[in-house]
Amino acid sequence: MAEFVRAQIFGTTFEITSRYSDLQPVGMGAFGLVCSAKDNLTGQNVAVKKIMKPFSTPVLSKRTYRELKLLKHLRHENVISLSDIFISPLEDIYFVTELLGTDLHRLLTSRPLEKQFIQYFLYQILRGLKYVHSAGVVHRDLKPSNILVNENCDLKICDFGLARIQDPQMTGYVSTRYYRAPEIMLTWQKYDVEVDIWSAGCIFAEMLEGKPLFPGKDHVNQFSIITELLGTPPDDVIHTIASENTLRFVQSLPKRVRQPLKDKFTNADPLAIGLLEEMLVFDPRRRIKATDALAHEYLAPYHDPTDEPIALEKFDWSFNDADLPVDTWKIMMYSEILDYHNVDSENQAMEDPLECP
């Protein structure tokens, strides 16, 4: 039986195994508190995320189960990886992952990024998305604070708590507004991997410009700002709008013509503008795919088709439509945790990190 020790962080009790020490708070999310810690077994610094009351409701239990399944399944250099998981005596769940020193949001607010770093960061984001999308997963909440970076410029996408299967009726407001694809605002229904490409395009533009591209005050203002730059959506996109109220709103907007991005990003590499033009397209069916974006001339210094892997198998979403009681989710969670700890250590080894430009 593992020995547990307690620590108070921001008034929250962390009840962790004695394998970890020197807890320091690094972030607070909607569903949990994250601390850095020393892994006394490996000597490495790690991130420990406490999921608050994971078994308090069926919805939260399912969300936690989904995040656990995704963290177990997704194994790629540009996606955050799970190094340990445990349930405390108080029945809180703790995810332990690798610790990276900062995130893209902090980098962008501290100083302008040089061209080679913008290229390298975008390359790694798209490399990670190619893998995630090949697994049948849409991140749905890609934003600078969900993109972690270490001192070697290695980049990893994190926070898959909102991630969903690629196809069914996806509903609601999921991503931070600035990075939200127009089809999420317009249809609230079907959307696919293209929403992540839009978000990556917004992040790319922010790296080029040093500030958010579409800083909407609310979703109406957000959509209006997008049309000021990209013009009025094509009719075939407008016809996909399911809500009559939304349709009336879009049709009430003044007709606008798409502005050349080169006029907005006057100092940017023309190749960067060319790729951005293909990422920020209203019609998701015409938006560039991660695989094609990686092959774009702008990313030629880093592109290597032999080292941009896809998932070995699709993620199993069969649980996702289940409406189960908390006790059933708890049993399933315990089973996943036991399975994780029985996996061969060789399956948990990650490849060598990429080199910094």
From Swiss-Prot:
Active site residues according to the UniProt entry: D141
Residue ranges of domain Protein kinase in the record: 20-299
Taxonomic superkingdom: Eukaryota
KW Cell membrane (keyword) present: no
UniProt-annotated location(s): Cytoplasm; Nucleus
Motif (TXY): 171-173
Reaction equation(s) it catalyzes: L-seryl-[protein] + ATP = O-phospho-L-seryl-[protein] + ADP + H(+); L-threonyl-[protein] + ATP = O-phospho-L-threonyl-[protein] + ADP + H(+)
Chain positions with Phosphothreonine modification: T171
Documented EC number(s): 2.7.11.24
GO CC annotations on file: cytoplasm; nucleus
InterPro entries linked to this entry: Kinase-like_dom_sf, MAP_kinase, MAP_kinase_CS, MAPK_p38-like, MAPK_Sty1/Hog1, Prot_kinase_dom, Protein_kinase_ATP_BS, Ser/Thr_kinase_AS
GO BP annotation list: stress-activated MAPK cascade
Example of a GO MF term: MAP kinase activity
UniProt PTM: Dually phosphorylated on Thr-171 and Tyr-173, which activates the enzyme.
Cofactor: Mg(2+)
UniProt keyword terms in alphabetical order: Activator, ATP-binding, Cytoplasm, Kinase, Nucleotide-binding, Nucleus, Phosphoprotein, Serine/threonine-protein kinase, Transcription, Transcription regulation, Transferase
Protein name as catalogued: Mitogen-activated protein kinase HOG1
Source lineage: Eukaryota, Fungi, Dikarya, Ascomycota, Pezizomycotina
